[in-house]
Every structure is written in C-alpha cells, then in structure tokens.
Amino acid sequence: MDESGGDSGSVATPVQQRAHEAWRIYQHYLDKTTPHANYRWIGTLVVALIYCLRVYYIQGFYIIAYGLGIYLLNLLIGFLSPLVDPEAGGVSDGPSLPTRGSDEFKPFIRRLPEFKFWYSMTKAFCIAFLMTFFSVFDVPVFWPILLCYWIVLFVLTMRRQIAHMIKYKYIPFSFGKQKYGGRSSSGSRAD
C-alpha cells in the first residue's frame, strides 16, 4: 500500500524541497535589490575588480577574460538597442521609435532591461572568477593579440551602434524625470 495517501508523483524529495527553499530565499534577496541600482552596480564593480586582480596576479586565464569581454560587449549592445529595431521593417509587435518629425513620441524600450543587464554581467564575472580555479581553462595564448582584437571589435561595434542611434534619433540613457525650470512665484498662492 502507498503510505503517502496521495499521488506519489507530486511528493518532492527532501533534497528537492531544500533546493526549492534555497532558490526562493535567493530570489527574495534578488528582488529586494531591484530598487537599489547604485548599490547593485557598486557591488558588480567590486566583483569585477576582484576578478581582474585574480587574473593579474596569477598571470593566466586570458582566454577566459577574452570570452568574458565578448560576452559583456554583447550585453552592452543589447542594453543600448531598442526592443523594436526600426531597420527591421514594418513588422512590429510593440512600440517603435519615431523616424520622422511627424511621428508621435514613443518611449525608448530597451532590448535588454537594466536589471537583466546587471544580473547577467554580475553572473558572468562570478562564473569567470570560478573558472580561474580550474587549470583546464588556462589555455596558453599571447594576450596582447586578444586585447588588440577585442579593442578593434569594440570600436567597430560601438561605431555601428552610435551610427544607428544617430540615424534613428534615440538616446538610450535617461537620468530620471525631466525637470522644467518654470518661473518662480514671488508671492504665496491663495487657496
């Protein structure tokens, strides 16, 4: 007889229950960081600095650093790109950017939101840091060639992205709500 008294397929093992509970706690703390963008980015900079110091002091794992750089460049392009690309044509699932002066204003919606950009970047630095503890990933390469190639790739990619921004007249950065300098009232308002 079945002692569980129900469907045995729905009963989770203690390991699965612990894993689910750990995931819920992790997600809770991750959700609590959402409104604190400055602190999140400071934490990511600290993680990036620790990773850079590790690579510098052990004098290796340059191929991991190169792969990380390519991945971060890909994330940056996603962060700077609009959700709906005006070059893609007429098919549009959501709001698009205005291309003519007569078009109505449509807000800039990123292809990769800031939180996902931060989370992916931080996760990438952590994974790259962990990879530096395994010698199998320490492929001997001449790092100046990788650095030069990455710089050329970065310059060409950003030139294309900036040309796209100029062509379609969008700016992917906003610094909060726009404030207008209205005239100051010299007297008090009568209610």
UniProtKB/Swiss-Prot annotation:
This is Protein RER1A. It is found in: Membrane. Keywords: Acetylation, Membrane, Transmembrane, Transmembrane helix. Belongs to the RER1 family. The keyword Transmembrane helix applies. One of its GO terms (cellular component) is Golgi apparatus. Involved in the retrieval of endoplasmic reticulum membrane proteins from the early Golgi compartment. Disulfide bonds: none annotated. It comes from the Eukaryota. The keyword Nucleotide-binding does not apply. InterPro entries: Rer1 (IPR004932). GO terms for biological process: retrograde vesicle-mediated transport, Golgi to endoplasmic reticulum. It is a multi-pass membrane protein. The chain crosses the membrane at residues 39-57, 60-80, 115-135, 136-156. The lineage of its organism: Eukaryota, Viridiplantae, Streptophyta, Embryophyta, Tracheophyta. The modification N-acetylmethionine is found at residue 1. It holds the Pfam family Rer1.
